[in-house]
Amino acid sequence: GTLEWVPKNEIDSLNLWEGDRIFHRLLDEEAPFFSLKLRYQDDLLKEAVLDGKPLELLDLLDENGEPSGQVRERTLVHLNGDWHRTSHVWVVRRRGDGGHDLLLQKRSREKDSFGGCYDISSAGHIPAGQYYLESALRELKEELGIAAEPEDLRLVGVHDGRYEGGFHGRIFKNHEKSHVFVYEKPVEIEKLKLQKEEV
């Protein structure tokens, strides 16, 4: 091995362990004292815990939209604009006149992006090692309290989403491949259990 001085602004362009990228981001943000625990399996980051709270790890995608074998923490994915996966579920209600209504959620103002905006009925990032459908079912349960079965969701398309901007004084680059599902079973809005952090 060797030792060399590297300008701070060039560190992120180097071949680093993913845990080092998280550590460097925290230093850049001038985070106060923190506890960061990392667990690797071979060379792959499997778990990252900051101050006792698990961080979201996402699979990065290759040029074909498939998991590349590389995993990265969510805030770094959005800082770098890395391609990743999400699931979107639209809850649809048929009206008597043949039209349709969509159930929208108004995002919490505390969200890291698009706070206070209306959004898809239920959506979320797909954790590393998981799949679109299982993630869609989990998000529907967590965000709205709807316990759906796999056959209750109908895949209606795949969407490549791109956005580059900023929120809360931070760079935000979103490059995502989303599987879009529709849920059409009857829903009584007053019986839904909303996830405070999301809605």
Describe each PLM feature range.
Residues G1-L26, G124-V199:
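Unchanged
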Residues E4, L58-D59, H88-W90, D101-L103, ...:
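Residues embedded in well-ordered beta-strands
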Residues L27-L55:
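Charged phosphate-binding loop/patch that engages nucleotide di/tri-phosphates or the phosphate backbone
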Residues D42, R74-L76, E198:
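A short, sequence-level motif marking secondary-structure junctions
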Residues P54-D97:
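Acidic, metal-coordinating catalytic segment for phosphate/diphosphate chemistry
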Residues T86-I126:
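A glycine-rich, hydrophobic loop/mini-helix early in the fold
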